[in-house]
Each structure stands twice: as C-alpha cells, then as structure tokens.
Amino acid sequence: MIDQKQTNNLCLRWKGKQRRIGITGGIASGKTIIGDFLFQAKQWPILDADLYAHEALSAESEIVKKVWLRYGSKIIKNSSKNDQIINRKALAKIVFQNELEKKWLEGIIHPFVNKRIEEELEKSKSNSIVILIIPLLFEKNYTGLCSEICYIDCPRSMQLKRLQSRDNLSIKEANQRIDAQWANSLKKQFADHIINNSNDDETWKLQLKKLYKF
C-alpha cells in the first residue's frame, strides 16, 4: 500500500520546456526495444537508467570496491588482481533472495544513477524532446523528471518466458525478479499512457505512431 504523500509524488510531472518522455514497465516488458524504436523513428536522445546502473558496477569504481568488500570472491568473475569483474548473475542471485541485501545495493547504486541522469539531462538540454528509460521510475520517485509516462504493459506469463530465455533463470528466480518490483496494476494507475506489448510488435508500434504522430 502507498500513502497519500507517495500518491502525490507519483502524480508529479516535469513542467519545463523540454518534453521528457518517461518509459517504464515491469522487468522484461520490452522497455528497451520500445525506446530504441522511438530513437530510430525520431532521433530523440535516450537516457537509460539500466545503462547507468551497469556503469556503476564497472571495474575499479568505488561502488565495485564496496561490493567486493561485502561479498568477497563469490561475486568476482575473474580473480586476477588486475582484472576483477563483478559476476552480475551471482550478485543478482544474492540480492533477489535477501531484501536487506537488495536495499543495501540499491542504496549505493541509485545515487550514482541519479547523478548520471542529471548529467545527461544537462548535456541534452538543447533537445526539445528526450526519452528516459527508467525501470524503477515509480519506485524511486522519478515521476517529477518526466513530462509524461508511458507504461509498457505485458502479461506476467510473457515476462516469465522472456526472463527465463534472456537471463537463463529458473521459474523461481524469474518470479523473484518480477515480485521485487511494484505490481503492474499499481504502476499502471499512475501512468499517462499504457502501451500494449502483450501481442505482436505491430500493436505497440501503431500506438506509438499515433501517440507521437509519425
């Protein structure tokens, strides 16, 4: 359940001159594909929170050092002193099975992601329209950065199928990933547009073409 303060925050929208299209949805709902489609069609710059989270765990960052100290060799892909790389699958397995560990990791990654989004918005301020792909847009209170929010809607069965195929997860692990986010039904209430990605690609393509007039 969310309280009135959270509800008010979820209703916030960016009121500046730049049009900022927020794209969000459940895990494996098709956010990146849809963002890429808009970029190919309109050449609008894309700011991708997942990309910045990936950067946060790149070699030799301060965040990586903290992760190494906390979890040790079990999350290191290469044990060479000169080339220690985070095993993201091993790390994900830890945090999605333990809420405290998940909160700890998010607590050090999200400030970095926030900073990168701010930096990229500054670089893109001359563009009249930008796209922000943010998986945890509602959960982490990014609604005030967006002029409008497109929620990519697809059934849980499709999310599970994609997660198992894409990330080689068991059905239990795939369900854990989905359950770690807010329910789709809740997030849809606070979106401005619902993009249907439950059928073939033409369905959402037609929606976007109509919505953004191309």
Swiss-Prot record:
Which CDD domains does this UniProt record tie to the protein? DPCK
Name the EC number(s).
2.7.1.24
Give the subcellular location: Cytoplasm
For this chain's UniProt record, which GO biological process terms are given?
coenzyme A biosynthetic process
> Binding residues for ATP, per the UniProt record?
28-33
Q: Which InterPro entries match?
A: Depp_CoAkinase, P-loop_NTPase
Give every DPCK domain span: 20-214
Write the record's keywords in alphabetical order, separated by commas.
Answer: ATP-binding, Coenzyme A biosynthesis, Cytoplasm, Kinase, Nucleotide-binding, Transferase
Q: Does the keyword Magnesium apply?
A: no
What's an example GO cellular component term for this entry?
Answer: cytoplasm
User: Keyword Lipid biosynthesis, does the record have it?
Assistant: no
Q: Which reaction does it catalyse?
A: 3'-dephospho-CoA + ATP = ADP + CoA + H(+)
Q: What is the uppermost EC class here?
A: transferase
Molecular-function GO terms, alphabetical:
ATP binding; dephospho-CoA kinase activity
**Metabolic or biological pathway:** Cofactor biosynthesis; coenzyme A biosynthesis; CoA from (R)-pantothenate: step 5/5
Chief location:
cytoplasm
Taken from the record, one Pfam family name reads CoaE
| Cited NCBIfam families | dephospho-CoA kinase
User: What is this protein's function?
Assistant: Catalyzes the phosphorylation of the 3'-hydroxyl group of dephosphocoenzyme A to form coenzyme A.
Similarity comment text for this entry: Belongs to the CoaE family.
Protein name, UniProt field:
Dephospho-CoA kinase
Taxonomy, top ranks, is: Bacteria, Bacillati, Cyanobacteriota, Cyanophyceae, Synechococcales
